[in-house]
Structure formats: structure tokens, C-alpha cells
């Protein structure tokens, strides 16, 4: 089969981007041809042996960019491929790999947002895949998504599949928490032996709740916060960096920018602090667990259930209360409790199903291609029979 994958932005470090590339490789390894289409490519060598075609897109806003890309992708792929797969909400897809929350679900309680063109545009794209009696096969990353989309659109259950976690097995390196490696990494980050080190990871600072972690530093004078994903000079982080300065905690924050050595950062840290307002999955949560790093997170994250299942930290119930967040952090300041959480998390990481999500997604995509081909053959056969009877 020849398959086209569409994703608006392709850049290093993004979870959706890693999923797109790795699933493309898995499908290709099954003997099929895959071409990735995008309109924003930050690293030309990112996909290695997978062909990547960049469609010019001069839109100035995110919603205009996605809508323009959806139109261009549909035009460029029509009748040229056996299966069309979207990693963003696009148009006339065969399969959608959905990593986003439902716009329509959020608009139900905030109808005034319809006044904004961005929400109208995103809802229109969402409807194309999720409206009842549609034909798009949808791959979800968490059960939370099924509840949202079904509530908003009454999407047919037979079109929806939920895959296991998409954590790559090579991200599991609990052996990195040995004293030797831990000390070396902490020294390189200018961390003292008695510093209580929090790690937060993400590029969407407010969505991931990193502003909440910054605010909590006031309550813990011996805590240091490492923020991986953005530098303090990035446009998205300047506002929070200034706020940290206003709070008097900026000297205890280290902005690390984009990092590929996350397992080393997790070895150096004492706690993963991920008080997100929303996270479809929160793969970093699971990554922390299997690497023996205790986790403080919120129930708004799809993978928060793994924290409780592994007994590897604390999950804050919704709605979020800052006082309970501080209380959870205070409880996590106990080294013996963190040690127990660390051992439980590393043991939980031995479960092989935690690393099978991308394989399952590739299987579902290939199955969808074969099903589409079978339906087309039946339709052609019926047409020939009908013509023969005339």
C-alpha cells in the first residue's frame, strides 16, 4: 500500500511528532510506502528514510495554518494514495491519530468562544472526522478522550480505538539513577547534594502547569526547579521568567531548553512535577515512573492513573487546589517515601504493555488500509455484476 501521513508541524522533541515518525517507520517495515506531508519542518533529517514533503503555507495564525494545510493536503493526496492518515484534525481522512482534546466538548460550556474564528475553524475540522455516521477510523491515546468526543459528537463506537501507552522502550533507563551518574549530572547542572530538585518538562508552560510549579517554589526554600523544553529567552517563556523574578524565585530555576537526555535529567531530579491543566496522556508522567522518578501530577492527565497503579507518587484531584498541591509537595519532601515510590515505579516499568502503543497504532492503520481495499473490491465487483445484468 501507499500511505500519506499528514501533520501540521514536524520538529524535534514533540511527542506527537515522535509518534508520527515512529509509526511511519513501523508501517514501512511491514512493506508499505509512507510519505509524510507537513507545512512546518524544523529538521530536514528528522525522519531519516521516510520521505517528507513540505507544503508551502503562509498563514499567520495556528488555526489558519491548520485549515490551509488541511485543504492543501487533501488536494495533493486525492486519488494518489491507498490510505490517508492525519496526525492533526484534517479533511477527508481515512484514519485520524488523535492526540488532542475535543474543541466541541469545551465549547459546550463556553459557547461565547464561537465568536472567535479560531474555535469555529477548529470545530469545523473536528466535525469532519467525528460527526456521527462518519467513516474515519479514530485512534485515541486515552480513555478520557473517548468520553469527551462521544459526549460532544456521539461518534460511532466502532470507529474508535484506544491504544496502550506510546512510550518508547529505549526511554526506560532506571539504571541511570545510580549514585555515580546522578552525582555527575547534578554537578554538571550546578546542583548541590542537599538541593531538593524538581523537574518539569514541556513547551506549553501554562497547559502543563509549569507556572504552578514556579509559584510553589515560594513554599520550599531548598527546592530547585529544572525546566526542560524551553530556554528563558524563548518567546513563550519570557512572561513566566519575569513572573519568577517578581516572586523572587528566579535564581532557583534552571531553564534547560530542548534536551534529548531526559533520562539523565530524571536521574538528577528528586521529583517530576507535572501539575497540568490538561494533558491528553502526559507521556512524561509514565517516563518518570519507569525511570524511578516519583511524580506529582493532576487527574487532568490521561496517564495519571499509572501513578496510582504503580504507587509512584501523588495525583491531585480536579478541580485543582493550590493548597493541596503544596501539601502533596510537602509530603514528597520525605526521602524515605520518595525512595519507596522510586522502587515501585521502576518495578512497574517491567510491564511490556507500557511500550506497545505505536506498534498497535501501526497495526490499526494497516488494518484500515486492507479493509478499505476490500470494500473497494466489493464495490467494483457489485458494479460489474450490475452492468452484466443489464
Please place each PLM-identified region on the residue numbering.
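A conserved mid-protein helix/loop that constitutes part of the nucleotide-sugar donor-binding site
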Residues: 18-22, 196-219, 235-238
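Membrane-proximal helix-turn-helix segments that form the acceptor-binding/catalytic region
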Residues: 119-141, 146-147, 153
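Aromatic "clamp/platform" in nucleotide-sugar-dependent glycosyltransferases that forms part
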Residues: 258, 277
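Short hydrophobic beta-strand element within catalytic cores of glycosyltransferases
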Residues: 294-298
Amino acid at each position: 500500500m501507499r500511505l500519506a501521513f499528514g501533520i501540521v508541524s514536524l520538529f524535534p522533541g514533540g511527542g506527537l511528532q515522535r509518534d508520527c515518525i515512529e509509526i511511519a517507520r513501523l508501517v514501512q517495515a511491514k512493506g508499505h510506502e509512507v510519505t509524510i506531508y507537513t507545512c512546518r519542518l524544523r529538521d530536514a533529517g528528522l525522519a531519516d528514510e521516510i520521505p517528507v514533503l513540505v507544503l508551502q503555507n503562509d498563514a499567520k495564525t495556528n488555526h489558519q495554518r491548520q485549515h490551509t494545510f488541511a485543504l492543501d493536503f487533501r488536494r495533493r493526496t486525492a486519488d494518489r494514495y491507498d490510505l490517508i492518515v492525519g496526525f492533526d484534525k484534517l479533511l477527508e481522512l481515512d484514519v485520524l491519530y488523535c492526540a488532542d482534546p475535543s474543541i466541541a466538548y469545551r465549547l459546550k460550556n463556553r459557547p461565547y468562544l464561537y465568536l472567535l474564528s479560531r474555535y469555529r475553524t477548529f470545530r469545523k475540522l473536528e466535525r469532519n472526522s467525528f460527526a456521527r455516521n462518519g467513516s474515519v477510523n479514530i485512534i485515541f491515546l486515552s480513555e478520557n478522550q473517548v468520553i469527551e468526543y462521544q459526549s460532544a459528537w456521539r461518534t460511532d463506537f466502532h470507529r474508535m480505538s484506544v491504544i496502550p501507552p506510546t512510550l518508547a522502550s529505549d526511554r526506560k533507563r532506571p539504571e541511570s539513577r545510580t549514585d555515580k551518574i546522578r552525582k555527575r549530572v547534578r554537578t554538571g547542572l550546578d546542583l548541590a547534594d542537599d538541593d531538593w530538585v524538581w523537574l518539569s518538562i514541556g513547551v506549553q508552560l501554562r497547559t502543563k502547569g509549569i507556572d504552578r510549579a514556579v509559584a510553589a517554589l515560594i513554599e520550599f526554600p531548598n527546592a530547585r526547579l529544572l525546566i526542560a523544553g524551553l530556554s528563558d529567552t524563548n518567546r513563550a517563556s519570557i512572561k513566566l521568567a519575569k513572573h519568577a523574578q517578581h516572586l523572587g524565585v528566579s535564581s532557583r530555576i534552571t531553564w534547560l531548553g530542548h534536551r534529548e537526555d531526559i533520562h539523565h535529567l530524571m536521574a538528577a531530579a528528586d521529583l517530576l512535577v507535572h501539575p497540568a491543566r490538561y494533558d491528553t496522556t502526559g507521556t512524561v508522567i509514565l517516563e518518570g515512573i519507569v525511570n524511578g522518578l516519583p511524580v506529582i501530577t493532576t487527574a487532568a492527565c490521561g496517564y495519571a492513573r499509572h501513578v496510582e497503579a504503580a504507587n509512584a507518587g501523588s495525583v491531585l484531584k480536579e478541580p485543582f487546589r493550590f493548597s493541596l498541591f503544596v501539601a502533596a509537595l510537602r509530603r514528597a519532601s520525605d526521602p524515605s517515601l520518595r525512595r519507596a515510590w522510586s522502587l515501585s515505579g521502576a518495578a512497574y516499568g517491567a510491564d511490556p504493555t507500557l511500550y506497545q502503543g505505536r506498534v498497535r497504532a501501526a497495526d490499526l492503520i494497516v488494518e484500515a488500509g486492507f479493509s478499505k481495499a476490500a470494500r473497494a473490491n466489493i464495490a467494483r465487483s457489485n458494479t460489474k455484476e450490475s452492468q452484466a445484468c443489464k
